């Protein structure tokens, strides 16, 4: 694998219970070349106001990228550079990478809360 590849894994949050996940991420896994763009979808079916996008790099804890406090609102987190977000519907929070860079190789997580 060359350094020119960017691997972005989007993993669903763990949940307790059977079929209904509550929060889901799409796609679950993605590999990009440097400079490519992509969008991750975080969807929740619990009518939550707050939604969050995090990244976790090797050897580090979760770091907040962006968050939303309701439909149509977004705010920057700890590491917002290189990302854009939108929340046009209460149940969906999109995270976009316009031009992927090797520094964005990470595991991405989304979450929601009241």
Curated annotation (Swiss-Prot):
Signal peptide positions (record): 1-21
Highest taxon listed in the record's lineage: Eukaryota
Disulfide bonds: 42-110
Gene3D superfamilies, A to Z: Immunoglobulins (2.60.40.10)
InterPro entries: Ig-like_dom (IPR007110), Ig-like_dom_sf (IPR036179), Ig-like_fold (IPR013783), Ig_V-set (IPR013106), TCR_beta_variable (IPR050413)
Gene Ontology cellular-component annotations: plasma membrane; T cell receptor complex
GO process annotations (BP): adaptive immune response; cell surface receptor signaling pathway
Locations listed in the record: Cell membrane
A Pfam family assignment: V-set
Glycosylation site positions: 84
Main location: membrane
Keywords: Adaptive immunity, Cell membrane, Disulfide bond, Glycoprotein, Immunity, Immunoglobulin domain, Membrane, Receptor, Signal, T cell receptor
Domain Ig-like: start-end pairs: 22-114
Assembly, per entry: Alpha-beta TR is a heterodimer composed of an alpha and beta chain; disulfide-linked. The alpha-beta TR is associated with the transmembrane signaling CD3 coreceptor proteins to form the TR-CD3 (TcR or TCR). The assembly of alpha-beta TR heterodimers with CD3 occurs in the endoplasmic reticulum where a single alpha-beta TR heterodimer associates with one CD3D-CD3E heterodimer, one CD3G-CD3E heterodimer and one CD247 homodimer forming a stable octameric structure. CD3D-CD3E and CD3G-CD3E heterodimers preferentially associate with TR alpha and TR beta chains, respectively.
Physiological role: V region of the variable domain of T cell receptor (TR) beta chain that participates in the antigen recognition. Alpha-beta T cell receptors are antigen specific receptors which are essential to the immune response and are present on the cell surface of T lymphocytes. Recognize peptide-major histocompatibility (MH) (pMH) complexes that are displayed by antigen presenting cells (APC), a prerequisite for efficient T cell adaptive immunity against pathogens.
Protein name stated in the entry: T cell receptor beta variable 6-2
Species of origin: Homo sapiens
Gene name in the database record: TRBV6-2
